[in-house]
Amino acid sequence: MIAVLEKSASLKTKADIVRFLEQSGFRVQVSETPEGSFVSVVGEGAETVADALRDMRGVAELRPDAPAYPLVSRAHKPDATRVKVEDVVIGGRELVIMAGPCSVESREQILAAADAVRAAGARVLRGGAFKPRSSPYSFQGLGKQGLELLAEARDRTGLKVVTEVVAPEDVDLVAEYADVLQIGARNMHNYRLLSAVGMQPRPVLLKRGMMSTVDEMLHAAEYVVAGGNPRVILCERGIRTFETSSRNTLDLCAVPILKERTHLPVIVDPSHAAGRREWVPALARAAVAAGADGLIVEVHPD
């Protein structure tokens, strides 16, 4: 439920409303916009205080049918969120390119990749130090050594670093080295992990699960924001369908739908959707045309 306050509402009036809701057992998030203050009431049973809230001084409108993900919805925050990573802004006027290898394999490989993507115009280096694999026998990443190599590549090139965190107990370690923490598609429903990254300040890149709906993705983002971290970037990376010609099916419709439903920035991963490098440029152009705020592209020096 969302309460829209009158533009003339005083600070004391706002404080009284927040105090009433908190004393009633709800979490409260206040968003200031040019249209006025939006007060999101987070928690089950909000309808029990609807009548009392509607009658309070300063409340202009009550929206009881607000989405079940109030903190990430446009209803809560009409203006688009810009996620800043020092001088890199995702969701602003610039199309931000993130690029790099799927996994950090060696010092030579990641430094060569960093040099190449920087020269091509990327602002963020991607690379996996911890890799969740479908097979337990596949390469799982270099771990802490991979994080150290990513940090060295950042020092050398000035690129920001995004890398995946796969377990709650690794969040602090990854946050020590990375500028952006990635939640991969396989972990989009890992709620303990989502809550853990929500309790640290680094931006979070949330990839859509391969069989997840747009609403399920927004619920996952809500976990992160509800934990206290509003710096979330959403990533469409393709979903699993009956089609077998490509690795996944890139859901371009998700980009404008997400832009309509949420204030969070949206980027697209054309590489994991395509599965073949010759198709990546076309999907990347299509993603930009659909309104994506950035691209995350797989690049390998070999």
Predicted region positions:
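Glycine-rich, proline-tolerant flexible connector loops at the mouths of alpha/beta enzymes
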Residues: 126-144, 300-302
